[in-house]
């Protein structure tokens, strides 16, 4: 089986870190040991610097919505071209904490940036490059933000309004309904059930990949 790019998506507090551990365990059970992890924004020295600016902002200078999305795509193209594509080319599997769907949901849905602009940015920056599988962890924003607050201080985006996260979630669900490579898992369930659902999704998907 050729190397694959698997992405975990979801709102704050959805449990992406736990989900990534579950995915790694499952892949290793199938004999896939050669893999790396990425996160967005971030994953390269330049992209990590952009991550800090996006997450925390700059004191005294509001970050405009368009500047935010352009910084995200700058970080993304650095990661894809310098890390993800080379890894896949040498036979390494890549498990990513967020990818382009986050921008489509957060900036396109949450910020309300024009859909045509978001599509144009994606196509210009990424071309036809897409994850092989995206697991979207869905849960009500109220639950996710409560979990996020329990982790500690919230960043600039996590401090957004509930309406912002409602719009973001709606855009996630919209994309998931349209794209067969995006599988939705109910992340409001107990963690054991979420893990079991992820196992099932991966088991079925890996069988499909093995059977061609």
UniProtKB/Swiss-Prot annotation:
A Pfam cross-reference name: Thymidylate_kin
GO biological process: dTDP biosynthetic process; dTTP biosynthetic process; dUDP biosynthetic process
Catalysed reactions listed for this entry: dTMP + ATP = dTDP + ADP
Residue numbers binding ATP: 10-17
Keyword Cell cycle: no
Keywords carried by this UniProt record: ATP-binding, Kinase, Nucleotide biosynthesis, Nucleotide-binding, Transferase
GO MF: ATP binding; dTMP kinase activity
Superkingdom field: Bacteria
Enzyme Commission number(s): 2.7.4.9
Keyword Transport: no
Enzyme superclass (EC): transferase
Cellular component annotations (GO), alphabetically ordered: cytosol
PANTHER family for the chain: THYMIDYLATE KINASE, UMP-CMP KINASE 2, MITOCHONDRIAL
Summary of the function given for this chain in its UniProt record: Phosphorylation of dTMP to form dTDP in both de novo and salvage pathways of dTTP synthesis.
Classification via NCBIfam families: DTMP_kinase (TIGR00041)
Family to which this protein belongs: Belongs to the thymidylate kinase family.
Protein known as: Thymidylate kinase
Organism: Photorhabdus laumondii subsp. laumondii (strain DSM 15139 / CIP 105565 / TT01) (Photorhabdus luminescens subsp. laumondii)
